[in-house]
């Protein structure tokens, strides 16, 4: 049931974004884009994440509405203009995947660094010594 709730949430968000955002942006310019972001994404986020149509487990990768909106946009063009649209979007999808992998690597490095700094704060040091001095002493086995 969780899968179907997520699919419904993704589909609703994707269809509304694809049908409303472009006319607002075309008719009202930049203001229309901001207006669309406010009147579409806000309520869709509330429905999907706050109400709980899309559930994200603590131990799983976070899946946001952007995935559903992106898939909806790609498939809309495939249905309207044919399979060539999917083929022409593959380089963009590939670059997005590479960006996601790089972002994951950077996020993991940041988390690792934050954990290391947190552990360093937890360690007790000798009065008047900082952690680096104590590490140097431990490496030289002077303690």
UniProtKB/Swiss-Prot annotation:
This protein's GO CC annotations: membrane
Topology of the protein relative to the lipid bilayer: Multi-pass membrane protein
Main function: Could be involved in the glycerol uptake either via facilitated diffusion or active transport.
Signals that turn on the gene: Repressed by GolR.
Keyword Aminoacyl-tRNA synthetase: no
Residue ranges of the TM segments: 6-26, 27-47, 60-80, 90-110
Lineage top rank: taxon: Bacteria
Location (main, coarse): membrane
Pfam family, one: DUF6905
Protein name, entry field: Putative glycerol transporter Lin0368
Disordered: annotated span: 118-143
